[in-house]
Swiss-Prot record:
Function: Plays a central role in chromosome condensation, segregation and cell cycle progression. Functions as a homodimer, which is essential for chromosome partition. Involved in negative DNA supercoiling in vivo, and by this means organize and compact chromosomes. May achieve or facilitate chromosome segregation by condensation DNA from both sides of a centrally located replisome during cell division.
Protein name, UniProt field: Chromosome partition protein MukB
Subcellular location: Cytoplasm, Nucleoid
Keywords of this entry: ATP-binding, Cell cycle, Cell division, Chromosome partition, Coiled coil, Cytoplasm, DNA condensation, DNA-binding, Nucleotide-binding
Provenance organism: Shigella dysenteriae serotype 1 (strain Sd197)
UniProt note: domains: The hinge domain, which separates the large intramolecular coiled coil regions, allows the homodimerization, forming a V-shaped homodimer.
HAMAP family, alphabetized: MukB
Secretion signal span: none
Length: 1483
């Protein structure tokens, strides 16, 4: 029998009162006896600290603090230590007789928080002779010792041979070592486990029934069914993994589309760029060659343009020089025309002014006559006015006389007024302000004499005027004519000059008559001269264009030669046009054929790709469409055979799965109904009783029981009878055996064992012979062996089924691929390759383009020659009619001679035209110039002055006469106011006076009117004279200007000048037009040269850039090709059908794929970075790197155990097949993995029954425990009503709740929680998740309710509570509960610890004075029966009969406090024996 481990001693080093004290512990009870403050609690605290060194748990409170929520600040530990290093060590010996010292080093930490530093350690291999105090202390002298620090202790122990020292950094490691060595009963894995252990120690230390333990008895007493829970967790993990795998498969199936999309878009992205670069490389090569051809052509064109530019520049310089002369000639001709036109206008003005002068002279003579008549009428009017005045005066005098007679005063008054008025008028007219009535007579005589003198003088001058007027007018006329012709001269020279002018006029008229014939002759000669000059210019131009000088005699022969050349070139051009049309037609046909082939090529290439893929997939070569259809028939036959074989393997695999499921049922029952019946009958399946039968004995027992191997063993058959009535849900044959399931044996049968068989004597007349089965299924070992073989067979069948399924799906997909090929590509797949024909046609097209180019060059040269010949013929056609003019050398001299004669004639005509009229007028009156009447103007002025003097004298004399006649009236001033009435005679006189005054007024008005009219006539006459003089002056100016112009203004002069100007203008225009043409041509030539130069530079730059680009691209392309070939992706990227797309289409295709790829790789950082780097257009190899990265990314996701290929495209095809197979397999696996709800209920019920039986056994050990009135203690275990209902529903009504357990969204734990909530809606689940609740429901401990009951006196069994028991009874009851807990822990941990170790059992009891002697004796008995150590702290009056007792007395010596300890072992039958130890005080 295995000995139980024991605690040998407890050592305290440097504790309060204990410097170095070792307490040897008794094998049963160790009692610490002493008064208050003796150190009992300190000793126990040191033991607990060494046992559980967790400062978060340690709390040493006094008994009075029991139940308090808070204690002292240091939790009772800091105050129990002394300053410096402290130790608490436990010396133990385990079941293997190994000595192990475990302990802790404690040290107070300075500070107000009163903290303690704890370091656990362990010592192994220590010799039995070495005491713990010797390890940690060093003796200085007889009365002094020193405590060793932990590092010195470590060094000291390492120096000892065979001794192991371990220091722990975690409490978990410390407790793990103590559990493995059998020091503690339970493995303390976590802080929760340490807390339970501490609560147990604390409960035992302070005694009583601990509410912390009784409230959680399930956690302390019921072991965690980790196996069942792990099975559930494994099952759920498998289901979860299976569902996650299914979900992953679904995700993978969706990712498969993503992968296909990724591969497709990556291929499009990279292949489009790859083919675009390939096309661009070819295009760049073609462009480089084209640039080189254009470069050479442009150089030739530039040289030709430079030669052409030199010729045109030379011709332009000649035209520029000629243009200056022509402009000067044209300007001179224009000026001459302007002068002629001006002279003609001047001549017209002169003629118009001469006509105006003649008209004005006539009008002037007429106006003179009118003025003379008006003067005569004016004199008559004046006489009539004077008569009217006399009559009025007479009537007035008569009226005055008569008035005087009637009224003297009135008459005098009137006369006076009239006299005053006359006097005033006389003063005014005579300019005599001092004139008076008295002096008027004297002045009258003076003015009458003056009037008479003036009249005589006027008459004398009038007579002289009439005589000189006629002679004066003729002389002036003749003199003015001479002045007009010859210019200003003296009047005495007029006669001689006039005669000379008349002779010159006769000569000029004779010359003027020759102007017209000379002008006509000159015009004719000038026209011929111009034609001769034009012919010379044309000939010079022609020679210059031909580049050779020709004589006049050679021109006709040259004309014939050029016409012959034109005819031959015209035929050549016509033939060249036809030849070009034939070449163009052939080129168009080739282009059309190439276009058709290029449209067919991608379709043919796609068909070839599909055909090659089919050939690779099936490993066959197809040469015609018939081969494809024949292979398709073979494929269909192969598919049918594979499907049949797959179905057979699947059926066998399902059978094996069913057998495995049947054998895997809990309890070894193959029929689930037997488990329900066994539970219903209160029995046990026979297979459960023989569950642990060995594999060797399984055939025997299987044959022994035969058909009854599935029987139910019940305690009493009579109690089952009532259950059999109406039983229908059971197997056809139900066997029941009466017996005790706990002690069942096979003695119920009489059996004889044979060779590999048995004979069972069922009754006297009935035997059964049963052979040993080849595959026994009785017992767990046999079932597991059979299940293992079935699993192996199932693996083979699954692999074969997977292979067949894969082959079937592969065949089906191949069939679909063939069907798609036949529908899409069969019509064109076996046609000839169009690309060789395209290459051949392209080479022919290049030849045609070259031929067309050469033909165009030849045709261009012929066209130039043709145009040059046509221009030469046109020029000769203009020159040949003028050959006679070219030969006439005297034409220019004749023109000059006629021009001189014409100038003389035109000068004479101009003189006759200018002065002909004046000479004609001068000729009849030239004789009057011999005498000059110079005094006529002076006479005329004197006459006018005498007339004015005569009129003034007459008016003055009249005014003075009137004053003299009224001189007597001045004395009537006093009668002015004395008026009276008039008579009839007075009225008549007055009327007659009025008539006379009216007549006088009319005469005056008439006089004034005639005077105004005379004034008008005089004004008209003056204006006519002024106009005549002005026009005469203007005429003289015009004649002088015409002479200054110096141009003959005849009728044909303007026409000749205009013709000359127009001819020069035409020549100038032609010259300018040609110059402009040359300038434009030169500008165009320069522009063309500039363009050619720029084009040449650009071509050179483009050629060298393109050449460099081709060279660079070649290196880059080589790198790309090397990378493509190294990674084996050329077949994927070199898609020949893309070669027929344009660069824009390929770029668009690549850009679209890039946009799709950005979305596809957005979640993959590596691919996203590689894709971003690949977007650099200058680094095409990065796109290949991206493509390789995509392939590598997909290869990494290929499961090589499933898909045996490195090609992601093929892998995706295989993946589709494999995923569908895996989906089917995992779905069936999930159905098999999912444990039934009935099985769960059975497992939980069986576990509950097992634990109830274990608790029942534990209760048997407590039946005889008694404390005071408590006669017995037991644990009552019941199933909770809500959980029992859950188990019933799971086992019997699970069909109603399959919506929970069949849901793919819920795990079994979650479904169980949902069912619990459905059954108990009144229970509040709080914030816990269904998964947490379900995991709790899978733990059988949550189904049980546990409580402690005591049998106390007459009350019988009642719930153990502190309030219902005395203190001693509570302590005893609590101790009993703790013993049960420790025993339960040992049972639970037995399978975790080595089988050769039985752990130490030790509990505490402080303040044991509350127990009576009977209770203490019961504790001793309990410790002895359970091999448990107990440490009791009791006052001095307690003296146990057994065990070891320590008496502690705390003393003070020289201000030093220490505890005096005396140990006693047994005192009743034996003498007291002092235990080892000393009372030394600390130094």
């Amino acid at each position: 029998m295995i000995e139980r481990g024991k605690f040998r001693s407890l050592t305290l080093i440097n504790w309060n009162g204990f410097f170095a004290r070792t307490f040897d512990l008794d094998e049963l009870v160790t009692t610490l006896s002493g008064g208050n403050g003796a150190g009992k609690s300190t000793t126990m605290a040191a033991f607990v600290t060494a046992l559980i060194p967790d400062l978060t748990l340690l709390h040493f409170r006094n008994t009075t603090e029991a139940g308090a929520t808070s204690g002292s600040r240091d939790k009772g530990l800091h105050g129990k230590l002394k300053v410096g290093v402290c130790y608490s060590m436990l010396d133990t010996i385990n079941s293997r007789h190994q000595r192990v010292v475990v302990g802790v080093r404690l040290q107070q930490v300075a500070g107000r928080d009163r903290k303690v530093d704890i370091k656990p350690f362990a010592i192994q291999g220590l010799p039995m002779s070495v005491q713990p105090t010797q390890l940690v202390t060093e003796t200085l002298n007889e009365r002094q010792a020193r405590v060793l620090p932990l590092n010195e202790l470590k060094d000291k122990l390492e120096a000892m041979e065979g001794v192991q020292f371990k220091q722990f950094n975690s409490i978990t490691d410390y407790h793990s070592l103590m559990f493995d060595l059998g020091i503690i009963a339970r493995r303390l894995r976590s802080a929760s486990d340490r807390s339970k252990f501490y609560r147990l120690i604390e409960a035992s230390l302070y005694g009583g029934i601990s509410s912390a333990i009784t409230r959680s008895l399930r956690d302390y007493l019921l072991p965690e069914n980790s196996g069942v829970r792990k099975a559930f967790q494994d099952m759920e993990a498998a289901l979860r993994e299976n569902r996650m795998t299914l979900e992953a498969i679904r995700v993978t199936q969706s990712d498969r589309d993503l992968f296909k999309h990724l591969i497709s878009e990556a291929t499009n992205y990279v292949a489009a760029d790859y083919m675009r670069h390939a096309n661009e490389r070819r295009v760049h090569l073609d462009k480089a060659l084209e640039f080189r051809r254009e470069l050479y052509t442009s150089r030739q064109q530039l040289a030709a343009e430079q030669y052409k530019h030199v010729d045109m520049a030379r011709e332009l310089a000649e035209h520029n020089g000629a243009e200056g002369d022509l402009e000067a000639d044209y300007q001179a001709a224009s000026d001459h025309l302007n002068l002629v036109q001006t002279a003609l206008r001047q001549q017209e003005k002169i003629e118009r002014y001469e006509a105006d002068l003649d008209e004005l002279q006539i009008r002037l003579e007429e106006q003179n006559e009118v003025v003379a008549e008006a003067i005569e009428r004016q004199e008559e009017n004046e006489a009539r006015a004077e008569a009217a005045e006399l009559e009025v005066d007479e009537l007035k005098s008569q009226l005055a006389d008569y008035q005087q007679a009637l009224d003297v005063q009135q008459t005098r008054a009137i006369q006076y007024n009239q006299a005053i008025a006359a006097l005033n008028r006389a003063k005014e007219l005579c300019h005599l302000p001092d004139l008076t009535a008295d002096s008027a007579a004297e002045w009258l005589e003076t003015f009458q004499a003056k009037e008479l003198e003036a009249t005589e003088k006027m008459l004398s001058l009038e007579q002289k005027m009439s005589m000189a007027q006629t002679a004066h007018s003729q002389f002036e006329q003749a003199y003015q004519l001479v002045v007009a012709i010859n210019g200003p001269l003296a009047r005495n020279e007029a006669w001689d000059v006039a005669r000379e002018l008349l002779r010159e006029g006769v000569e000029q008229r004779h010359l003027a008559e020759q102007v017209q014939p000379l002008r006509m002759r000159l015009s004719e000669l000038e026209q011929r001269l111009r034609e001769q000059q034009e012919a010379e210019r044309l000939l010079a131009d022609f020679c210059k264009r031909q580049g050779k000088n020709f004589d006049i005699d050679e021109l006709e022969a040259l004309h014939q030669e050029l016409e012959a050349r034109i005819a031959s070139l015209s035929d050549s051009v016509s033939n060249a046009r036809e030849e070009r049309m034939a070449l163009c037609q052939e080129q168009e046909q080739l282009q059309s054929r190439i276009q058709s082939l290029m449209q067919r090529a991608p379709v043919w290439l796609a068909a070839q790709n599909s055909l090659n893929q089919l050939s690779e997939q099936c490993g066959e070569e197809f040469s015609s469409s018939q081969d494809v259809t024949e292979y398709l028939q073979q494929l269909l036959e192969r598919e049918r055979e594979a499907i049949v074989e797959r179905d057979e393997v699947g059926a066998r695999k399902n059978a094996v799965d069913e057998e495995i499921e049947r054998l895997s049922q809990p309890g070894g029952s193959e029929d689930q109904r037997l488990n329900a019946l066994a539970e219903r009958f209160g029995g046990v399946l026979l297979s459960e009783i023989y569950d642990d039968v060995s594999l060797e004995d399984a055939p025997y027992f299987s044959a022994l029981y035969g058909p009854s191997r599935h029987a139910i063993v019940v305690p009493d058959l009579s109690q089952v009878t009532e259950h059999l009535e109406g039983l229908t849900d059971c197997p056809e044959d139900l066997y029941l055996i009466e017996g005790d399931p706990q002690s069942f044996d096979d003695s119920v049968f009489s059996v004889d064992e044979l060779e590999k068989a048995v004979v069972v004597k069922i009754a006297d007349r009935q035997w059964r012979y049963s052979r040993f089965p080849e595959v026994p299924l009785f017992g767990r070992a046999a079932c597991e062996s059979r299940i293992e073989s079935l699993h192996a067979e199932r693996e083979v069948l699954s692999e074969r089924f997977a292979t067949l399924s894969f082959d079937v799906q592969k065949t089906q997909r191949l069939h679909q691929a063939f069907s798609r090929f036949i529908g899409s590509h069969l019509a064109v797949a076996f046609e000839s390759d169009p690309e060789p024909e395209i290459r051949q046609l392209n080479s022919r097209r290049v030849e045609l383009e070259r031929a067309l180019s050469n033909h165009e060059n030849d045709n261009q040269q012929q066209r130039i020659q043709f145009e040059q010949a046509k221009e030469g013929v046109t020029a000769l056609n203009r020159i040949l009619p003028r050959l006679n003019l070219l030969a006439d050398d005297s034409l220019a001299d004749r023109v000059d001679e006629i021009r001189e004669r014409l100038d003389e004639a035109q000068e004479a005509a101009r003189f006759v035209q200018q002065f002909g009229n004046q000479l004609a007028k001068l000729e009849p009156i030239v004789s009057v110039l011999q005498s000059d009447p110079e005094q006529f103007e002076q006479l005329k002025e004197d006459y006018a002055y005498s007339q004015q003097m005569q009129r003034d004298a007459r008016q003055q004399a009249f005014a003075l006469t009137e004053v003299v006649q009224r001189r007597a009236h001045f004395s009537y001033s006093d009668s002015a106011e004395m008026l009276s009435g008039n008579s009839d005679l007075n009225e008549k006189l007055r009327e007659r006076l009025e008539q006379a005054e009216a007549e006088r007024t009319r005469a005056r008005e008439a006089l004034r009117g005639h005077a105004a009219q005379l004034s008008q006539y005089n004004q008209v006459l003056a204006s006519l004279k002024s106009s005549y003089d002005t026009k005469k002056e203007l005429l003289n100016d015009l004649q002088r200007e015409l002479q200054d112009i110096g141009v003959r203004a005849d009728s044909g002069a303007e026409e000749r000048a205009r013709i000359r100007r127009d001819e020069l203008h035409a020549q100038l225009s032609n010259n300018r037009s040609r110059r402009n043409q040359l300038e434009k041509a030169l500008t165009f030539c320069e522009a063309e040269m500039d363009n050619l130069t720029r084009k040449l530079r650009r071509l050179e730059r483009d050629y060298f850039e393109m050449r460099e680009q081709v060279v660079t691209a070649k290196a880059g392309w080589c790198a790309v090709m090397r990378m493509v070939k190294d990674n084996g992706v050329e077949r994927r990227l070199h898609r020949r059908e893309l070669a027929y797309l344009s660069a824009d289409d390929l770029r668009s295709m690549s850009d679209k794929a890039l946009g799709a790829l950005r979305l596809a790789v957005a979640d993959n950082e590596h691919l996203r970075d590689v894709l971003r780097m690949s977007e650099d257009p200058k680094r095409p190899e990065r796109k290949i790197q991206f493509f390789v990265a995509v392939y590598q990314h997909l290869r990494e996701r290929i499961r090589q155990d499933i898909i045996r290929t490195d090609d992601p495209v093929e892998a995706i095809e295989q993946m589709e097949i494999e995923l569908s197979r895996l989906t089917e397999e995992l779905t069936s696996r999930e159905q098999k993995l999912a444990i039934s709800s009935r099985s769960v209920a059975n497992i939980i019920r069986k576990t509950i029954q097992r634990e109830q039986n274990r608790i029942r056994i534990l209760n048997q050990g407590l039946q005889n425990v008694s404390f005071g009135q408590v006669n017995s203690v037991r644990l009552n275990v019941n199933v909770r009503e809500t959980h029992a209902m859950l188990l019933d529903v799971l086992s019997e009504q699970h069909e109603q709740h399959q919506d929970l357990f069949n849901s793919n969204r819920l795990t079994f734990s979650e479904a169980l929680a949902k069912l619990y909530q459905r059954l108990n809606p009144q229970i509040d689940m709080g914030q816990r998740t269904p998964q947490t609740i379900g995991e709790e429901l899978l733990d059988y401990r949550n189904y049980l309710e546990m409580e402690v009951e005591v049998n106390r006196g007459s009350d019988g069994w009642l719930r153990a509570e502190s309030g219902a028991l005395s203190t001693g009874e509570a302590i005893g009851t609590g101790m009993s509960i703790l013993v049960m807990v420790v025993q339960s822990w040992e049972d639970e941990s037995r399978r975790l610890r080595g089988k050769d170790i039985s752990p130490c059992r030790l509990l505490f009891l402080d303040e044991a004075a509350r127990l009576d002697a009977r209770s203490i004796a019961t504790l001793f008995e309990l410790c002895e029966r359970l091999q448990m150590q107990l440490i009791i702290a009791a006052p001095e009056n307690i003296s146990p009969e057994k065990g070891t007792t320590y008496k502690l007395v705390r003393k003070v010596f020289q201000n030093t406090e220490h505890v005096h300890v005396v140990g006693l072992r047994g005192f009743a039958p034996q003498l007291p024996e002092t235990l080892p130890g000393s009372d030394e005080a600390p130094s």
